[in-house]
């Protein structure tokens, strides 16, 4: 599947309506758009949150099989009320939609508690680097989340995931991985890297 976002230098932001329409028209594999109104922190004001509600509704009603969100409150905890509202909007429009909580988790307080809150809210997946700069550095927390909490929501390692380390992350018990599949921050997706990653995953 593809996580679709704009604003790559900012860590990903909500793609435009035109890009969403194009994705529906031309992409044959599952596409999960990100809903994030701006770069920076993950605590949003009322106007930003209102735009997120509208974007979640739009994406869910367009027929995308999943989407990606993440909100923290001013204290640095998962914003349970706002996340619950967004999940409710998405699943009212599409009851089977899969919802991933993105790397806002890596800035959250008390990661075990945060993970348990995401499970209670009903998130499908968690994208995380284990609260470290990259997934290999955060492998201890990733492993703990997977093994101690039944991998529900599914823990998806992300952050500098490459063909030469993906096997180590899969060995932790991960059933999903996330990679930009680029050779540098200034280049686009590299098909060869995608192929190598896919081969590693399918070999498990």
Please place each PLM-identified region on the residue numbering:
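Hydrophobic, well-structured mid-protein blocks that either form specific transmembrane helices
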Residues: 60-113
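Glycine-rich phosphate-binding active-site loops on the catalytic face of alpha/beta enzymes
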Residues: 1-12, 58-75, 123-136, 172-193
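C-terminal helical cap(s) of enzyme catalytic domains, especially alpha/beta-barrels
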Residues: 16, 20, 140-148, 170, ...
């Amino acid at each position: 599947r593809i996580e679709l976002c704009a604003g790559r230098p900012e860590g990903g932001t909500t793609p435009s309506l035109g890009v969403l329409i194009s994705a529906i028209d031309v992409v044959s594999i599952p596409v999960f758009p990100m809903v994030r109104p701006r770069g920076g922190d993950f605590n949003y004001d009322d106007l930003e949150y209102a735009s997120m509600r509208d974007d979640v509704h739009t994406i869910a009603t367009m027929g995308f099989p999943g989407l990606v969100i993440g909100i923290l409150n001013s204290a640095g905890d998962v914003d349970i009320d706002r996340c619950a509202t967004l999940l409710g909007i998405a699943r009212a429009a599409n009851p089977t939609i899969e919802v991933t909580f993105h790397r806002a988790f890596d800035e959250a307080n008390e990661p075990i508690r945060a993970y348990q809150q995401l499970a209670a809210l009903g998130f499908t997946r968690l994208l995380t680097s284990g609260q470290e700069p990259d997934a290999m550095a955060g492998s201890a927390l990733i492993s703990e989340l997977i093994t101690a909490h039944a991998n529900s929501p599914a823990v998806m390692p992300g952050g500098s995931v490459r063909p030469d380390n993906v096997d180590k992350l899969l060995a932790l018990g991960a059933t999903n991985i996330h990679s930009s599949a680029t050779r540098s921050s200034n280049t686009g997706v590299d098909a060869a890297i995608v192929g190598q990653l896919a081969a590693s995953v399918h070999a498990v």
